[in-house]
Structures are given as C-alpha cells and as structure tokens.
C-alpha cells in the first residue's frame, strides 16, 4: 500500500503534468489533495504555483499566506519566492510581468502576513546588507515598525561601516535617517555619536567635492538634531545660511553653561560649529577676481611708525585686529574668529582627547593644517608657525614665500631670508592684476590682512614691507641721499599713505640740495613727486641744486651716464651746465609722459633691478659692484 508521502508526490506530479495543458484538471487534483493532506507543503506550494501561473493575484495571495504562515522554516522553494517578492517590492518601478505579479499579489496579503514576511526574511538572511535593505523596505511599508526595529538597523549600519564606510554611510544618510527623523529611537550615546560622526564624514566629502554645500550643511544640522533627540539632548538651532554665526555661538555658550564637564552634547555641537566656521573660512579664502579663482592668504599687516616714539610699538596683549582690505575681509575674519573660539573651547582639558579622536576620523587634514598655521600667526606664535609651515606640503612656493615674509614682519624686522622672499614673490607674480588695497597700515595696533594673490596686492605688500623697514632710517642722522630717492620711488604706489615720511624726505632733499638724476629719469613718474621736485629745482635761483648721476646698481651704464662710462655726471641750477634747465625740463616732460604707465610693473622692476642697493639700505651689505654716490 502506497505511503502518504507517495500519494502526495503522485498527486503533485499529476497536477504538474496537467498545469500547462489543462489547468482546471490540475486544480482539481490539487483541491482533492489539499482536502486529503492539508498539512503537506508540496501540495500547498503547487496550489500557489497554479494560481501564480494563472495570474490570479488574490488566490495566489491566499495560498502564499497559508504557506508563509505554516511552513516558515522548512523549504527552500518558499524562501526563493519570498526573495522574489521582496526584490520586486524593492524595485517597484520595473515593469516586467514577474515584478508586476509579485507587487500586485503583495497588496492582497494581510498586513500581518506582509510584516511577518519581512521579519522572517531579516531573521533568516545571512547577508548584512540584504537584511538592511529589507529593514528599509519594511519601514517604508510599515513606518510604525521603525519605533522598535530602528535601533537594530542602526547597529547593523554601524557594523557595516567598519568594512565599507562609503556604502553604509550613504544608506544611513540618504535612506534610513529620513525615515526616522520624525520619531528617532533612543540609542546608546556611543552608537548615536558613531552614527553622527559617520554622517558628518559623508557630508564633508560632498562639501570638499564642492557640490551644493548649503544643502550639505542643512543635512548635517538635521542629522545633529536627530542624534541629539536619540540621546535626549537640548535641541540646537536649525541651519540657515542667513543666521549670523554669533547666534550659534551664543546658543552653544548657553548649553555649555548648563552642561556637566566634558558633555558629549557640547562636544558635538561645538565640533559641528567649528567645522561649519572652518569651512566658511576656507571657502571664502578663494574669490573670483577677473575670471580667475584668487586665493587670500592671512599675513601680518604694517604698523605705522612715529618718530616721536609715542609707545605705539609696545606689544599689546590684545588680540590683533583684521584690516578691511577687500570686500570679503569681513566674512573671512568672522568665520576665522568663530572657528578660533570653537577650537579654543574644544582644546580645553574636558574636550581635548575626544575632540582629537574626532578630528582623526574626519577628512579635514588640509583645512586643519591651513587653519592652525593662520591661528599661530594670529596669536603671534612665530616658532609654532614655522613648525607648522614645515608640515604643510600642498601650498605653492609663492604662498610659502609670502608667509615667510609675513613671519619676518611679525618679529619686527626683516631678515635676509625675508628680503629674498620678496624677490621670489616678484619673480612669480600671477597674471591676475587685481586692485590696490586699503588699510594695509594701522597706527598703534597689530593687525592682520587677508591678502589676495594678485599682482597689485603682492607688489603692494612687498613695497610696504621694504618701506616699513626703511622709513625710520629717514629720521636717523646721516641718512644716505640714495635711500631718500629709493623710498620716494616706492612711495609712488600710495603717496598719501605716509605724508610725514614724504615731507621729511623732501625737507632733507631741500637741505642737501641734491637728488639722484638716474632715479628721477628712470623710476619717478608720479605727477605730485615730479611737481615737487620741479618746484625745488625752480626755487633754487641763488643756491645751487644738483641732480647727480652715476652707473646703476648693477654696474650697467644708463642713458644719463656720460661717455666715460663710470664717470659721475651732475646738472645744477647754476654753474658749468649751460643747458641744465632745458635738460631738466626735458627729463620732467619725459617722466610726465610716462605717468600712465603701470606703477605696479614699474615698482616690481625697480625692486628687481635695484635689489642690491635695497639690500645695502636694509642690512648694510657691501655692494659687490660700484654704487651710485650722491653729492
């Protein structure tokens, strides 16, 4: 007598034989078999296949429900169908007949069966990523299930980030967090902080790729709020690019005042605000000028020197000011100062260890190295700045030369290295012309300047550095005549910047009754200077005033050098030179005709061509070639 299993198998085979040719007969066999053997999986599954092949969604759903309820843990065929069903639900936009069947059949399943299918799939899947996708699918279909199941999903995401951080971070921020943001689950502080750090890392990569940074910061602040809710933190402020950063800082200070030492809440709020301010600083350091991206570099500003010795050079304990030299200076200074505030808070004993670990986990190394160098300059920590500069490998030689020059100015005197940096800067001037800057010098207070890397600004800074070193020599006894002329040449960039210095130079010229002819005929093109020199010349009717000339600083004869080559020449208001007045007028007319020349180019050439003489002025270095001697 055949066994029950043999009878079941016989009936299934008969139904399978007739399934294509006579579905009704096949169904009759299955109905009879189900009546005789209601607990037989093969019969129940064959009944489902008949309904599936006939595209009977509702009847297929009934059969599938019975199988899924009664035979959860037993048969491979069932799990294959469940996988096909969940794959179709995850890709509902696909229009294949197979996908369409599963999607429509799913709608006829009871909610309880639907939910159980998801949970059984999650519990029996060995693939972590597959389980995560089923969780996401279940939360989309059953939003309330996230209340109890989200912690488990978030733990799985955190685990997956150890091996594939990019993939699991994207799933977290783009798929999971939006589903739980309205009612975040409670999590352990460690897990919530790990998830926030991973989200922050994901969005920072977007920001560094220069995608839509406003959206990225909006999402970062949103994730911060979600993770804060998970840990029961006092809410921070939502992101708005129109909110002044002072508002965020004041909110942070308010939270800090009511929090215990080393609070994770303050740590993460302050870290977020620090990175936000740091990004604003780094982003604004690059500005579009004349169709070119121009970087701004933080450098030491010039302090006006007074011969009266009013104590203005006594170092102040106050932090330096920021000069408003460009339109972007206010934004840059605010972002920098807010980043500095947060940095100082986060490097106190209560936060330093955890903050350092956070910084190691985030892709911020280029920003941090730039910021720390600028911070060292800001606080006047020259030794630290030098050490940090040695660790910065990505900057250009132009920027490095500018920063070394700035460090020279910070210490109050220019070294030979600083002067060599000026020559290197002038040899690497960019093509972007730019404009001259205002407020490069302040009286009585150390200040910082955000210098754009344009031709005009760089030459202006180099000229200012030389003048700041030489200007006080004008008030010393026995100042060389040549020095007076060279400073006048440099002052053409901004003649009104130091009226007292200009007056002192002209007073000395009047007293000594001489000026260098080559300096006048080669480098002086400013109308005001030419008029003043003409006035001095024309006013010397009785006393002789001489213009003297000799070989230039490189030893090469100029147009005004006599045929003898190295012989000095002089013309005066009276004496042997009969055509002196006509020659002087010709020289001044020639220079006036040049008044529209590019003074930036003129002064860059002057410094390059006369660098040996300038070095002698600054350092007292003996010239290896003949110098111009003024009577």
UniProtKB/Swiss-Prot annotation:
Q: Does the keyword Ligase apply?
A: no
Which stretches are tagged as biased composition: Polar residues? 545-570
What processes does the entry annotate via GO biological process terms?
A: RNA polymerase II transcription initiation surveillance; snRNA processing
Q: Which segment of the chain is annotated as a signal peptide?
A: none
Enumerate the InterPro entries for this protein. Answer: ARM-type_fold, Int_cplx_su10
Q: Where in the cell is it found?
A: Nucleus
Q: Which UniProt keywords apply?
A: Nucleus
Q: Give the family, as the similarity comment puts it.
A: Belongs to the Integrator subunit 10 family.
How does this protein assemble?
A: Belongs to the multiprotein complex Integrator, at least composed of IntS1, IntS2, IntS3, IntS4, omd/IntS5, IntS6, defl/IntS7, IntS8, IntS9, IntS10, IntS11, IntS12, asun/IntS13, IntS14 and IntS15. The core complex associates with protein phosphatase 2A subunits mts/PP2A and Pp2A-29B, to form the Integrator-PP2A (INTAC) complex.
Function summary: Component of the integrator complex, a multiprotein complex that terminates RNA polymerase II (Pol II) transcription in the promoter-proximal region of genes. The integrator complex provides a quality checkpoint during transcription elongation by driving premature transcription termination of transcripts that are unfavorably configured for transcriptional elongation: the complex terminates transcription by (1) catalyzing dephosphorylation of the C-terminal domain (CTD) of Pol II subunit Polr2A/Rbp1 and Spt5, and (2) degrading the exiting nascent RNA transcript via endonuclease activity.
Protein name, per record: Integrator complex subunit 10
Lineage at the top is: Eukaryota, Metazoa, Ecdysozoa, Arthropoda, Hexapoda
